Curated annotation (Swiss-Prot):
Residues the record marks as active site: 981
Cellular location(s): Membrane
Keywords, sorted A to Z: ATP-binding, Glycoprotein, Kinase, Leucine-rich repeat, Membrane, Nucleotide-binding, Phosphoprotein, Receptor, Repeat, Serine/threonine-protein kinase, Signal, Transferase, Transmembrane, Transmembrane helix
Record lineage: Eukaryota, Viridiplantae, Streptophyta, Embryophyta, Tracheophyta
Protein name: Probable leucine-rich repeat receptor-like protein kinase At1g35710
InterPro entries to which the protein is assigned, alphabetical: Kinase-like_dom_sf (IPR011009), Leu-rich_rpt (IPR001611), Leu-rich_rpt_typical-subtyp (IPR003591), LRR-RLK (IPR052592), LRR_dom_sf (IPR032675), LRR_N_plant-typ (IPR013210), Prot_kinase_dom (IPR000719), Protein_kinase_ATP_BS (IPR017441)
Pfam families for this protein: LRR_1, LRR_8, LRRNT_2, Pkinase
LRR repeat locations: 78-100, 103-125, 127-150, 151-172, 175-198, 199-221, 223-246, 247-269, 271-294, 295-317, 319-342, 343-365, 367-389, 391-412, 415-437, 439-461, 463-484, 487-510, 535-557, 559-581, 583-605, 607-630, 631-652, 655-677, 678-701, 702-723, 726-748
Catalytic activity, reaction form: L-seryl-[protein] + ATP = O-phospho-L-seryl-[protein] + ADP + H(+); L-threonyl-[protein] + ATP = O-phospho-L-threonyl-[protein] + ADP + H(+)
Keyword Lyase annotated: no
Chain positions with Phosphotyrosine modification: 929, 968, 1022, 1029
Protein's organism: Arabidopsis thaliana
Length: 1120
């Protein structure tokens, strides 16, 4: 064998050996990988779809990749792909074979039940190209080690429960094209290093808790096509660098806290198809450059603070399908160019300040499905061209100022499902063409000036669920076929002039949930007019002309919560079945001709909050069972024939606000009602009550109106009535009362009519036409026995009078000395006045550590407020600034100031912060107030957590409390007091969230930056507009400020520019949904109704003409 032949032989032998070895190693590797996977599988709770994963671990035979579900191998037999998406596996990565599967390039474990953390060892799989763990239950952090995967192109971790921050190391994955971390619980900021990912096309970070700004470096990702950062907590402005992303097609930044303007550079992104910046805090105008985005199909900018007009250039984007600009502050008219958008299906411009007419060109948008222009200031008529919109299913034009008739052409919109034209000024009749709406589900025409008969065609649709036609001038009979489709749920016909019987189809309309017929001329037998309604929860057919007896079938409507049939001609006894309707919350049968007695079974209605049976012929005793209705808030049994005593158990109505038992035949004494601490109105007049007025009535600290007139009450009026600080209206006439009136503003202002026919009452106020209290009765003649009795008594009285005068002189002298006291340390004089003398100067100085900053709780324009912990109480001490102190030290000013402060200490109202006293010293001058634990309203509203605790119920009570306090100060004082500075900073709350006004009257006293103290009044943003030119402060200035305060409570912050626009436009329409504080759950039920009433009141208060504003008395009465 030659040398060459020998070498060739050796080479072939070595090659053969290497192939044998290679095959052996490969086989060993695949077996090891298989065994490793089987070990991981054994940890799964559920692995039914992996039944093909079978291998005998005791043999060395290889396994076939193709036979294992979801497993693929490379050419050498090593596992490189693991695709187990949606296989239902439930387990963790604790035993995942990272070392054995080092060749993995593709991993898809999405849509399973994997839990636990993502191990950092995944960062060692250097060949990984595709990695998807989305839609699992994974927790913990995203490991920074993933940044080592230089070849990774796709990373999907979305829809898990991952926390912590996004690692900046992810910016090292230079091959990355798709990165989805959305729908987790990630926090922290977006790493600027992501801007290094030049190949990144898709970045999804939406639905997390990310904060901070959007990094400008994201504008470097030139390959980007989809960028979604929505539904986070991002702040700051939108970087103008995003305009560099020429390939970007989708930009979602909605539902963040972004501020600033929309960068005009966004108009450079010519590939853009979907742009959503809605639900942020963006300001400024809509850039006209957006009109350059020729491929745009979606433009969503709603719920921001955008101003200015709608750019006409938007009408050039012919590809536009969805345009949403609602809930902003846009002004001007709707551009007619929008009519060019032939492909537009959705146009939302609602809740702005748009004016002018609706362009007829909008009728050219043939693809339109949903058109909402409501809550604006649009005028003119509804364009007849809307009849061309054959595909339109939703048309909302409500809350505008539209006039004229409803065009017949609207009936051509045969696809219509929901039509709302309510709260405009439309006239004429409802077009007959509405009968073409065969798909109609909801029709709202309420609060217009529509008249004539309601056409039968309105009820043609078998899909009709909601028909709201109230507050118009409709006449005639109502269409018989109203419930033709048996789907009608909500019908409201109230406040029209409809007549005749209720349609028979309504009697059998089992689908009804809510029905209102009040304020019409409907007739017929009430027993036959209505049927049985399984789902009905509210019905009101009051103020009509129904007759007959109440049907017992109402018991068979198991969900009925409110049954209201007042002011009809209903007769007979109340059926016993009514008392079995335990779900009732409101029962109003008032002003009919019902008779009979109330049974004990009335106590079954334990959910009842409002019971009105007044104006009937009911008789007998009031049953004791009534006292079981502990949820009652309003009770009216007046104008009946009830007799016997008022039950003593009435003190169980702890939630009761008003009770009227007047015009009956009740006798006996007034029961003890001391537990009814929420009672605001009590009317027991026109009965046969006798005995004395119980002193316990003075416990009713919320009582605002008390009428005890036309009874047989005798004796003195309890002196404890002087503590009833909320009482503003009293009538005790036509009784047998005697003695002096209580010394309160309410009794001093009481009219002669409210006091007359009480022969023993006395008063020194001439207008009350009572005998003077100083008058003594002369003894009758020949009264020797009387003389012998009276002389010793009068002698004793004279001696006692002398002693009393002497004692009073001493006390006054001590108080005078207290008024000019001496500092125990310096011997210097100081002036101190305290209403009860219990606050000592030295105690206050010591408790505040001589006004150390650690005790500071607030700072104002003229003072600092400190908390002082005294031995038995906590007080607030308002220390005046030195400039104020110097002004007050002037003799003339000081005396006037002291007189005013002393007057203010006499104020007693539960919604006014109590001023205890005042101290003037060379070193310190301060006022002493009661301490309010929750602090000021503005601080609560500025704190998100505190604002959430300030529920709608609490906010409503704040409005009521402030209204009652202002009414008291304006109308119930002998000398009215104007606050001058009503603002959220001057409304304080205690631990129970009871609102009290602070600085009442002191605003005038302490503003001394002008020789005329009236020259400055109020806090910026709350001052009435007329003050700028009159420089006069009146009660109507407080009313204006109160209107601002209402809006502030509803919005959750100062209403800003909205105030001036409402002041200049008294007819302004406001949507509660658009302005209500989003930190509190959306108001519902009674709270929503109360808030709507308060918004209406705020609009009245903000009228530019002060004479057009209501008085605080009328406001307070409305809210009572």
């Amino acid at each position: 064998m030659g040398f060459a032949e020998k070498n060739l032989y050796d080479f072939r032998f070595l090659l053969f050996i290497s192939i044998i070895l290679s095959c052996s190693i490969s086989a060993s590797a695949t077996i090891a990988e298989a065994n490793a996977l089987l070990k991981w599988k054994s940890t799964f709770t559920n692995s039914s779809k992996l039944s093909s994963w079978v291998h005998d671990a005791n043999t060395n035979t290889s396994f076939s990749c193709t036979s294992w579900y979801g497993v693929s191998c490379n050419s050498r037999g090593s596992i490189e792909e693991l695709n187990l998406t949606n296989t239902g596996i439930e387990g963790t990565f604790q035993d995942f074979p990272f070392i054995s599967l080092s060749n993995l390039a593709y991993v898809d474990l999405s849509m399973n039940l994997l839990s636990g953390t993502i191990p950092p060892q995944f960062g060692n799989l250097s060949k990984l190209i595709y990695f998807d763990l989305s839609t699992n239950h994974l927790t913990g952090e995203i490991s920074p080690s993933l940044g080592n995967l230089k070849n990774l192109t796709v990373l999907y971790l979305h829809q898990n429960y991952l926390t912590s921050v996004i690692p900046s190391e992810l910016g090292n994955m230079e091959s990355m094209t798709d990165l989805a971390l959305s729908q987790n619980k990630l926090t922290g900021s977006i790493p600027s290093s992501l801007g290094n990912l030049k190949n990144l096309m898709v970045l999804y970070l939406y639905e997390n808790y990310l904060t901070g700004v959007i990094p400008p470096e994201l504008g470097n990702m030139e390959s980007m096509t989809d960028l979604a950062l929505s539904q986070n907590k991002l702040t700051g402005s939108i970087p103008s660098t995003l305009g560099n992303l020429k390939n970007l097609m989708v930009l979602y930044l909605y539902e963040n806290y972004l501020t600033g303007v929309i960068p005009p550079e966004i108009g450079n992104m010519e590939s853009m198809t979907n742009l959503a910046l809605s639900q942020n805090k963006l300001t400024g105008s809509i850039p006209s450059s957006l009109g350059n985005l020729k491929n745009l199909t979606l433009l969503s900018l709603f719920q921001n603070y955008l101003t200015g007009g709608i750019p006409p250039k938007l009408g050039n984007i012919e590809s536009m399908i969805d345009l949403e600009l609602s809930n902003n502050k846009l002004t001007g008219s709707i551009p007619s160019s929008l009519g060019n958008l032939k492909n537009l299906t959705i146009l939302y411009l609602y809740e702005n300040y748009l004016t002018g007419v609706i362009p007829p060109e909008l009728g050219n948008m043939e693809s339109m499905i949903d058109l909402q222009l409501n809550n604006n200031k649009l005028t003119g008529s509804i364009p007849s061209s809307f009849g061309n919109l054959k595909n339109l299913t939703y048309l909302y034009l409500y809350l505008n100022y539209l006039t004229g008739v409803i065009p017949q052409e609207l009936g051509n919109m045969e696809s219509m499902i929901n039509l709302d034209l309510s709260q405009n000024k439309l006239t004429g009749s409802v077009p007959d063409s509405f009968g073409n709406f065969t798909k109609l589900e909801s029709l709202y025409l309420r609060v217009n000036h529509l008249s004539g008969a309601i056409p039968p065609g309105v009820a043609n649709s078998s899909h009709l669920t909601t028909l709201i036609l109230d507050t118009n001038n409709f006449t005639g009979f109502f269409p018989e076929t109203v419930c033709k489709g048996r789907k009608l749920q909500n019908i409201s016909l109230d406040y029209n002039h409809l007549e005749g019987p209720i349609p028979k189809s309504l009697r059998d309309c089992k689908s009804l949930i809510r029905a209102r017929f009040l304020g019409n001329k409907f007739t017929g037998d009430i027993f036959e007019a209505f049927g049985i309604y399984p789902d009905l929860n509210f019905i009101d057919f009051s103020h009509n002309k129904f007759h007959g007896e109440i049907s017992s079938n109402w018991e068979k409507s198991p969900k009925l919560g409110a049954l209201i049939m007042s002011n009809n001609n209903i007769t007979g006894a109340i059926p016993t079945e009514i008392w079995n309707m335990t779900q009732l919350v409101e029962l109003d049968l008032s002003t009919n001709n019902l008779f009979g007695e109330l049974p004990e079974a009335i106590g079954n209605l334990t959910n009842l909050s409002r019971l009105r049976l007044n104006g009937n012929q009911l008789s007998g005793r009031v049953p004791a069972g009534l006292s079981f209705l502990t949820n009652l808030e309003s009770l009216d049994l007046s104008s009946n024939n009830f007799s016997s005593e008022i039950p003593q158990t009435f003190d169980s109505f702890l939630k009761l606000h008003d009770m009227n038992l007047s015009r009956n035949k009740f006798d006996g004494s007034i029961p003890r009602l001391s537990k009814l601490t929420q009672l605001t109105q009590l009317d027991l007049s026109h009965n046969q009550l006798d005995g004395e007025i119980p002193s316990q009535l003075s416990s009713l600290q919320s009582l605002d109106k008390l009428d005890l007139s036309h009874n047989n009450l005798s004796g003195l009026i309890p002196t404890t009535f002087e503590g009833m600080i909320a009482l503003t209206n009293v009538d005790i006439s036509n009784n047998k009362l005697e003695g002096p009136l209580p010394d309160t503003p309410t009794f001093r202002k009481a009219t002669a009519d409210a006091l007359e026919e009480n022969i023993g009452l006395c008063s020194n106020i001439p207008k009350q036409r009572l005998k003077p209290c100083r008058e003594l009765k002369k003894p009758k003649k020949n009264g020797n026995l009387v003389v012998w009795i009276l002389v010793p008594i009068l002698g004793v009285l004279v001696i006692l009078s002398i002693c009393a005068n002497t004692f009073t002189y001493c006390i006054r002298k001590r108080k005078l000395q207290n008024g000019r006291n001496t500092d125990p340390e310096t011997g210097e004089n100081m002036s101190i006045f305290s209403v009860d003398g219990k606050f000592k100067y030295q105690d206050i100085i010591e408790s505040t550590n001589e006004f150390d900053p650690t005790h500071l709780i607030g700072t104002g324009g003229y003072s600092k407020v400190y908390r002082a912990n005294l031995q038995d109480t906590i007080i607030a001490v308002k220390r005046l600034h030195d400039t104020i102190d110097e002004e007050i030290s002037k003799p003339v000013v000081k005396q006037e100031f002291l007189n005013e402060v002393k007057a203010l200490t006499e104020i007693r109202h539960r919604n006014v912060v109590k001023l205890f006293g005042f101290c003037s010293h060379r070193r310190h001058t301060f006022l002493i107030y009661e301490y309010m634990e929750k602090g000021s309203l503005n601080k609560l509203l500025a704190n998100d957590e505190e604002a959430k605790r300030l529920t709608w119920t609490k906010r409503i009570n704040v409005v009521k409390g402030v209204a009652h306090a202002l009414s008291y100060m304006h109308h119930d004082r002998i000398t009215p007091i104007v606050h001058r500075d009503i603002s959220s900073g001057n409304i304080l709350l205690d631990n129970d969230y009871t609102a009290k006004i602070s600085d009442f009257g002191t605003a005038k006293l302490l503003k001394t930056d002008s020789s005329n103290w009236s020259a400055v009044a109020g806090t910026y943003g709350y001052v009435a507009p007329e003050f700028a030119y009159t420089m006069k402060v009146t009660e109507k200035c407080d009313v204006y400020s109160f209107g601002v305060l209402i809006l502030e409570l509803i919005i959750g912050k100062h209403p800003g520019d909205l105030v001036s626009s409402l002041s200049s436009s008294p007819g302004e329409a406001l949507s509660l949904r658009s302005i209500s504080d989003e930190r509190v759950l959306e108001p519902r039920g009674q709270n929503r109704e109360k808030l709507l009433k308060m918004v209406e009141m705020a609009l009245l208060c903000l009228q530019a003409n002060p004479e057009s504003r209501p008085t605080m008395l009328s406001i307070s009465t409305t809210f009572s």
